[in-house]
Structure formats: C-alpha cells, structure tokens
Amino acid sequence: MPRKGPAPKRPLVVDPVYGSPLVTQLINKVLVDGKKSTAERIVYGALEGARAKNGADPVATLKKAMDNIKPALEVRSRRVGGATYQVPVEVKPGRSTALALRWLVGFSKARREKTMTERLMNEILDASNGLGGAVKRREDTHKMAEANKAFAHYRW
C-alpha cells in the first residue's frame, strides 16, 4: 500500500461568469465525457433561465436551492454482532454539498422537459421553493435517520 497519505485537496477554480465556486462544482457535476464547454452551456443557460423566470440573482437562487437540498443527517450501515444496523450520523459540510449537487443533477436528468438546460433550470427553481425530487430525497434521508435514532449510540 502507498504510504504517502491522502492526496491534497486542490483549490477549486471559480467560474468566469459568476465568480462562484458552487457554480464551478455544478458544472463539473453536469460534465459528461470531458465536454466542459457543453456542461458550461447547460449550467449557464439554466441559471440565465432561472433569472428570467423569477427575476432574482441566479447564484442566490442556486444557493437557496442547495440549502433546501443539503442533508444534515444520513444513515450508515454498521455491523454489530451479526446484525446490520442503519446508524444515523451527521453529514460533513463537504459531503452534504456533494450529495446535494449529485441529487440536483440526477433528478434533473430524470425530468421530462426537452433539454437538459430546461430540466436543470426547473429543478433549481423547484428546489429553491422547497419542491422537486432532490428536496424529497433529502426529506426521505432525514426520515430514515429519524426512524433509526434508536441506534445512534452505535455511532463511530
């Protein structure tokens, strides 16, 4: 096994249009087959569409959507004496952002609108209003954690 330890975190380059690291992370999550310019077109189009629809700052809308999607708790499997328990644990800030972006893009892809730009825009707008599949996923995750609160003492 290598003994160098974990790879250092590289600084995230902020996007040139909005100057937000969150937008850069979203672009990287939308990215497919290394087509960065296509991913940028999709994300920027979705944010501009969100600005046109609700008239607010698109980055603020995205941040509000992310706050509504980010999970505070999740369950992790823990084996104790032959039984597997779903143990509720707090989610670290970096992981909660990563999960929120993953859910946002995943539920955008599953939507029925014609273009990915429209799907992403509508999912962001829905999430900022507390609706949509990504917000439902967060609520389901929190419900699972609440239901398994009895096993919280197995936390590590």
UniProtKB/Swiss-Prot annotation:
<dbReference type="InterPro" id="IPR020606">
    <property type="entry name" value="Ribosomal_uS7_CS"/>
</dbReference>
<keyword id="KW-0694">RNA-binding</keyword>
<dbReference type="InterPro" id="IPR005717">
    <property type="entry name" value="Ribosomal_uS7_bac/org-type"/>
</dbReference>
<dbReference type="InterPro" id="IPR036823">
    <property type="entry name" value="Ribosomal_uS7_dom_sf"/>
</dbReference>
<dbReference type="InterPro" id="IPR023798">
    <property type="entry name" value="Ribosomal_uS7_dom"/>
</dbReference>
<keyword id="KW-0687">Ribonucleoprotein</keyword>
<keyword id="KW-0699">rRNA-binding</keyword>
<dbReference type="GO" id="GO:0003735">
    <property type="term" value="F:structural constituent of ribosome"/>
</dbReference>
<dbReference type="InterPro" id="IPR000235">
    <property type="entry name" value="Ribosomal_uS7"/>
</dbReference>
<dbReference type="GO" id="GO:0006412">
    <property type="term" value="P:translation"/>
</dbReference>
<keyword id="KW-0689">Ribosomal protein</keyword>
<dbReference type="GO" id="GO:0015935">
    <property type="term" value="C:small ribosomal subunit"/>
</dbReference>
<protein>
    <recommendedName>
        <fullName>Small ribosomal subunit protein uS7</fullName>
    </recommendedName>
</protein>
<comment type="similarity">
    <text>Belongs to the universal ribosomal protein uS7 family.</text>
</comment>
<dbReference type="Pfam" id="PF00177">
    <property type="entry name" value="Ribosomal_S7"/>
</dbReference>
<dbReference type="GO" id="GO:0019843">
    <property type="term" value="F:rRNA binding"/>
</dbReference>
<comment type="subunit">
    <text>Part of the 30S ribosomal subunit. Contacts proteins S9 and S11.</text>
</comment>
<comment type="function">
    <text>One of the primary rRNA binding proteins, it binds directly to 16S rRNA where it nucleates assembly of the head domain of the 30S subunit. Is located at the subunit interface close to the decoding center, probably blocks exit of the E-site tRNA.</text>
</comment>
<keyword id="KW-0820">tRNA-binding</keyword>
<dbReference type="GO" id="GO:0000049">
    <property type="term" value="F:tRNA binding"/>
</dbReference>
